[in-house]
Amino acid sequence: MKYDHLLVRYGELTLKGSNRKKFVNQLRNNVNKSLKGLDGFVVKGKRDRMYIELEDHADINEITYRLSKIFGIKSISPVLKVEKTIEAMSAAAIKFAQQFEENSTFKIDVKRADKNFPMDTYELQRELGGTVLKQIENVSVNVKRADHEIRVEVRLDAIYMYEEVVPGSGGLPVGTGGKTLLMLSGGIDSPVAGMEVMRRGVTIEAIHFHSPPFTSDQAKEKVIELTRILAERVGPIKLHIVPFTELQKQVNKVVHPRYTMTSTRRMMMRVADKLVHQIGALAIVNGENLGQVASQTLHSMYAINNVTSTPVLRPLLTYDKEEIIIKSKEIGTFETSIQPFEDCCTIFTPKNPVTEPNFEKVVQYESVFDFEEMINRAVENIETLEITSDYKTIKEQQTNQLINDFL
């Protein structure tokens, strides 16, 4: 079947009332950005849905795949746009039915948005179903459990007919909910947290704490790859890599061993808080999950949060670990996250970290040294990368160049 349009259904945009135009425009921008590099299509965003007009050479499978990854889209259907006549509808219905397997069942489903169309819903269903039965052998009607469902939408401008409905990612268009800073480690949780807030229309930039030589270049490349996977959904993402060695060593030098984990995370939060204001973000996002590890008890969260007045969003707070793993696999970050390269959260880990840190104690331990200068230096020396869906690390670029030189 050669389709001439893609029908794109909005997710929660129908709930946005007078603000819908803003959301539709943002979604259209996101669609154009996602489809960059492809040709043979025209995007037409309307109030209640979006249509993508396809030329003969358009790669419909690739376009549909990319659309399915965009937040704010509920579903996509390849459709035939036909004239508003029963003859045109009947001809299209026969085209669909010609692809049915022998002895299969079908039904006709009609939605009539144009109430002025001369035939009502039931008349159209009977007429089109009867035409298929007359023209196609060895098929029958089953309105309850049909093998195939020919869907017909009678709209003001034309009639759209389709069978397939491809699920989208749902949620809201990224760019409609403000900007946040994602604390991105190399673990399973934080990429999922980033994906969850993006699903709610939020733009992210990411911050990662790198402690060479204690953390390797492979650990850094792992985080770049996680960012690249997230960027497949939303376009380029800025990744801010913080040189954290100096701060981390000083924490381990002056803070009681049982409190180093708490203090280290407080330093991360102080750095993140400064960056939030620089980039114009409204909140910090992390992958913390209540009660999983010593740093993620309520006592720890209280002690760590105290260094910032910026809202800290924890999308995974109440998830079971298995739920997070399932989501990680669904979004494609799991295999990268489990690569065995240590990040700065796993080095210098005390054998017996305090699970209910006393806030006054951690402040007292940190008071013996003025960390502000080190924090400012870490912020000043941040390395910022813009990660796209086709981003390649320096190592990958060098490898490709060697291959090209060899060939």
From Swiss-Prot:
Alphabetically ordered keywords of this record: ATP-binding, Cytoplasm, Nucleotide-binding, RNA-binding, Thiamine biosynthesis, Transferase, tRNA-binding
* Cell compartments where the protein resides: Cytoplasm
What's the catalysed reaction? [ThiI sulfur-carrier protein]-S-sulfanyl-L-cysteine + a uridine in tRNA + 2 reduced [2Fe-2S]-[ferredoxin] + ATP + H(+) = [ThiI sulfur-carrier protein]-L-cysteine + a 4-thiouridine in tRNA + 2 oxidized [2Fe-2S]-[ferredoxin] + AMP + diphosphate; [ThiS sulfur-carrier protein]-C-terminal Gly-Gly-AMP + S-sulfanyl-L-cysteinyl-[cysteine desulfurase] + AH2 = [ThiS sulfur-carrier protein]-C-terminal-Gly-aminoethanethioate + L-cysteinyl-[cysteine desulfurase] + A + AMP + 2 H(+)
GO BP annotations, alphabetical order: thiamine biosynthetic process; thiamine diphosphate biosynthetic process; thiazole biosynthetic process; tRNA 4-thiouridine biosynthesis
Determine if Cytoplasm is one of this entry's keywords: yes
Q: State the pathway, as annotated in the record.
A: Cofactor biosynthesis; thiamine diphosphate biosynthesis
GO cellular component terms, semicolon-separated: cytosol
InterPro entries cross-referenced by the UniProt entry? Rossmann-like_a/b/a_fold, ThiI_AANH, ThiI_fer, ThiI_N, THUMP_dom, THUMP_ThiI, tRNA_STrfase, tRNA_sulfurtransferase_ThiI
- Positions of ATP binding: M183, L184, H208, F209, R265, G287, Q296
One term of GO molecular function = ATP binding
Known EC number(s)?
Answer: 2.8.1.4
* Family as reported in the entry's similarity comment: Belongs to the ThiI family.
Entry function: Catalyzes the ATP-dependent transfer of a sulfur to tRNA to produce 4-thiouridine in position 8 of tRNAs, which functions as a near-UV photosensor. Also catalyzes the transfer of sulfur to the sulfur carrier protein ThiS, forming ThiS-thiocarboxylate. This is a step in the synthesis of thiazole, in the thiamine biosynthesis pathway. The sulfur is donated as persulfide by IscS.
NCBIfam families xrefs: tRNA uracil 4-sulfurtransferase ThiI
Please report the name of this protein according to its UniProt entry. Answer: Probable tRNA sulfurtransferase
